[in-house]
Amino acid sequence: MPTPNPAAMDFLLSRRSRPAKTLKAPGPDKAALMPLLTAAARTPDHGKLEPWRFIVLRDAAMRRLADAVADCGTRLGKSDEDIAKARDAWERSPLCVAVVEVQKDSPKIPALEQTYSAGAVCLALLNAALASGWGANWLSGWASHDRGFVEGALGLASHEKIAGFIHIGTEGATPPERPRPDLDQIVSWVSE
């Protein structure tokens, strides 16, 4: 028989991302962040390739990225509203962890599985932050797919991609619950 962990299950059944616009200082310091990164790095990783890495962004780096995302938006012809929304996430949030997908050459592990592992790291980091009492949100957005932004503002190599930006801070306001998937519409049972 399995040994249940009711507290963990209760957390997973009630977890809720916090909108980045509601996050405020303080964010976790290095001592508080390291266990969250450790938890995230325990993600499923077929072949133990570690096809991801972390960039911790805070303080002046957040303000620099707010300016960089605005410049990127202007270059891409984004609307003033889109630019303001993207900039706002970087200006308000006290800390962000960029999860970077770093594909590794492997004759056994397909690239897609490495992408899934990087996504799993994002979710694990998000859940670790929420379980530790922080407000957190997993964002990406148009700038995360722009090579000029990710290479120029974040220093990514040409073979690296952003899997997600995990913004972490103190929760400013509890968001209302949102509708959840109807399991009757998405679950198939096969017994033969």
Label each PLM-derived region with a short phrase.
Residues 40, 97, 103-150:
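Small-aliphatic-rich amphipathic alpha-helix that forms the alpha element of a beta-alpha
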Residues 1-92:
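N-terminal amphipathic, basic helical "cap/leader" segment at the start of enzyme domains
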